[in-house]
Design a protein with these regions (language model features):
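A structural micro-motif at secondary-structure boundaries
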Residues: 526-533
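Sec-dependent signal peptide recognition
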Residues: 2-9
Length: 699
């Protein structure tokens, strides 16, 4: 009886204490929220236009508006940002937490937040976190209440972790994977990320346009759903922040977009930003490695991994982590490899993103890019002064010449450990080519404009590890800009929505091998004829696209994964079998095969993998392809010869990305499939007559 009483008193006291603590926290964060004031104007498409007197006010409003439309993906990110995937997914999630903790991401943020993050940026980040917390207070029954309160460190961690995927640590691991049977904990974080399928940014100036305008189409390809899907918003303050464009859940800054003076977009590039070093271990002491002739102690730490075992039962596992002077150490097949990669201790990405958001000229934007905390991406820029620019942004290590850095490096010599980046002026960039056009589509940085304006690759060190791949989108861009001697608004959009494959592309060359093959069945001979007559388009009425895209997809997926594709004959036979089983024939209309699904409805859509109208589909339960990545939010911005701006955009779904009860859940789908745009209502006068709702937060 006494034990029961003690248990009851303990539980009662604990519950009372928790409730008291929760109320104190709520009161504290409500008081914090009341220090901000933001005006949210929803346009007729539901897109939020946020205004605040200060940048911090605007960031607070942005966080609240985004949470209204998509709190789920913002909150889901916090499992990863806090290295708590183990508490969500058990052992598989703990493996992801291990890598984040080995890389000391949260540790560095907590240690260096006040010194590394600029004060004006801290104010914005802290206001953004306060906006999320205010939404959570207003919606206390949400299923992610365990993340309350969100902190500024959570926000910075998101930027650092995203930088991780592009920094090269995963490339280092992939290099080792080709040599050894690598442990799961070193690859699971990479394999659990959505595939980023590429991007397009096209820019033209008065040297190419028929009306002396300057134009840019920003067309980043992301997953259409999830934590890396685009959200459209407009942020404006009286402190000079006036950006509209795309951002990810949990971001207070626009990643791709425009203001009244400039616009930019990014595409993924793949410079070699990482290295793996093979260490020599002391045979008498496994905790020492050889460096410059001397045995050197590893730095050793214990990593704690809280993990869900079953239901509410949790357990904290402990793992050892080793570090050399090169970086974190992986033990693989009785060998020790140290990793070194660009940005490995940098948490300043937020400073650079904010500087870009506040830029208003070419020089200001370039100054932001010179910060080098964003370690990769191709940047394409345009402005009202008729400037266009291509930048192969790369925080490339300053490496010793004469060494093949694609291979594993000798870890016993300290002179092979690089400690700085090549100068900004030494990375590829083109400003105002005489051709008047730039097309960045994840390709060779020396083939982004007319041949007479392209850079000479021989002027760049091989230690930069610059990519040489060409995409179909790159070939088609070059062909189309060559075909159209002058470009106007409609022609520029025609190029953007082109849905054909080039005969120069890897995809076509892969398929063409099938043309000369001999088959012994009527079914395969008929399918071969269908493939031969394909005009390489992916328009809705095309009857060869289903077979063609099916076959070439194997090559494209293999290239993305840096694998050798299977024999095209095997792909061909597999596709004939798949299409026949699904449609009863190998030549269904592309409109019967390729869809975008939303709100229980499927709508046919043109485009396909690696065409400029990029649609990356996944098979659904019926065997059809449903768009999962590619064209999402895209934006067309222009300035006429007088500097007057026009802008239009479209989102694959609508602004209310998670609210199925809202008309804005899917109200842009039809425009999307019709390859049309909506106005952005960026100008105050346009927004004033196209407003659906105005409200203030806090109320």
């Amino acid at each position: 009886m006494m034990i029961r009483i003690l248990i009851y008193l303990t539980l009662t006291f604990t519950l009372f204490s928790c409730q008291s603590a929760d109320k104190k926290a709520v009161d504290f964060y409500l008081e914090q929220a009341n220090s901000y004031k933001a005006k949210i104007t929803r346009d007729i498409w539901g897109v939020p236009h946020i205004y605040g007197e200060t940048d911090a006010d605007a960031a607070f409003g942005l966080a609240y508006a985004h949470a209204e439309d998509d709190f789920i993906n913002t909150a889901e990110n916090f499992y990863l940002y806090r290295a708590q995937m183990g508490l969500k997914e058990g052992a598989s999630g703990a493996i992801q937490d291990y890598l984040i903790k080995v890389l000391k991401i949260r540790e560095r943020i907590e240690l260096n937040y006040l010194t590394d993050i600029d004060e004006e940026v801290r104010k914005v980040i802290e206001a953004y976190a306060a906006g999320i917390n205010y939404w959570m207070i207003q919606n206390p029954n949400n299923e992610y209440s365990q993340f309350f309160p969100v902190t500024e460190q959570d926000i910075v961690a998101g930027f650092s972790i995203q930088n991780l995927f592009f920094s090269g640590v995963m490339s280092s691991i992939e290099k080792l994977q080709r040599e050894e049977n690598i442990k799961e904990e070193y690859t699971s974080l990479y394999r659990n990320q959505e595939l980023v399928t590429g991007s397009n940014v096209l820019a033209v100036n008065s040297n190419k346009t028929s009306d002396n305008s300057t134009r840019i189409i920003i067309n980043s390809h992301q997953p259409l759903d999830g934590p890396l899907a685009w959200y459209e918003a407009h942020i404006r303050s009286d402190e000079g922040w006036n950006m509209m464009g795309g951002l990810f859940p949990g971001s207070p800054f626009v990643f791709v977009g425009f203001n009244e003076n400039i616009a930019w977009g990014f595409t993924v590039n793949k410079p070699d930003l990482s290295d793996s070093y093979l260490l020599e271990i002391n045979p008498d002491n496994n905790n020492q490695y050889l460096l410059d002739g001397s045995w050197t102690d590893f730095e050793i730490e214990t990593i704690k991994l809280p993990t869900k075992i079953f239901g509410p039962i949790k357990w904290t596992f402990k793992r050892e982590a080793k570090y050399s002077v090169h970086g974190p150490v992986l033990e693989i097949a009785d060998k020790h490899y140290a990793l070194r990669f660009s940005g490995m201790s940098d948490i300043k990405q937020v400073n650079q993103w904010f500087a870009m958001n506040k830029s208003n000229s070419l020089e200001e934007w370039k100054s932001a890019m010179k910060m080098r905390s964003i370690i990769s991406f191709n940047g394409v820029y345009a402005d009202k002064e008729d400037n266009i620019l291509f930048l192969h942004n790369s925080s490339s290590p300053k490496r010793s010449e004469g060494i093949d850095w694609k291979n594993v490096i000798d870890g016993t010599k300290s002179d092979l450990i690089w400690n700085s980046y090549v100068d900004f002026d030494e990375i590829p960039q083109i400003i105002n080519p005489s051709s008047g056009w730039i097309a960045s589509t994840n390709q060779d940085p020396f083939k982004v404009t007319d041949s007479k304006d392209n850079l000479d690759s021989s002027n760049y060190s091989p230690t930069l590890g610059l990519q040489t791949r060409m995409t179909n989108r790159a070939y088609r861009s070059i062909e189309l800009f060559d075909e159209y001697k002058e470009v106007d608004e409609d022609t520029f959009d025609l190029i953007k929505f082109d849905n054909k494959y080039s005969k120069q592309s890897r995809s076509y060359k892969y398929i063409a091998k099938i043309f000369e093959m001999q088959f012994d069945t009527e079914e395969l001979n008929f399918a071969q004829a269908i493939l031969k007559e394909w005009n390489l388009g992916t328009d809705l009425n095309n009857t060869s696209a289903a077979l063609g895209v099916c076959v070439l997809s194997n090559e494209w997926i293999s290239e993305q994964g840096q694998r050798i594709p299977q024999n095209p004959e095997i792909s061909f036979k597999e596709c004939v079998k798949e299409l026949t089983a699904t449609y009863g024939k190998v030549n269904p209309l592309w409109s019967d095969r390729n869809f975008i699904a939303r709100g229980g409805e499927k709508t046919s859509v043109q485009g396909g993998p690696d065409v400029l109208r990029a649609i990356y589909g996944r098979n659904d339960d019926e065997g059809d392809l449903n768009a999962a990545g590619g064209d999402g939010l895209y934006i067309h911005v222009s300035w006429n010869e007088n500097g007057d701006q026009d802008s239009k955009s479209i989102h694959q779904y609508g602004s209310a990305t998670q609210d199925m009860s809202s008309k804005h859940y899917d109200d842009q789908v039809q425009l999307y499939v019709d390859e049309k745009y909506k106005s952005t209502f960026f100008e105050k006068k346009d927004l004033a007559i196209n407003t659906s709702k105005v409200y203030y937060v806090p109320e």
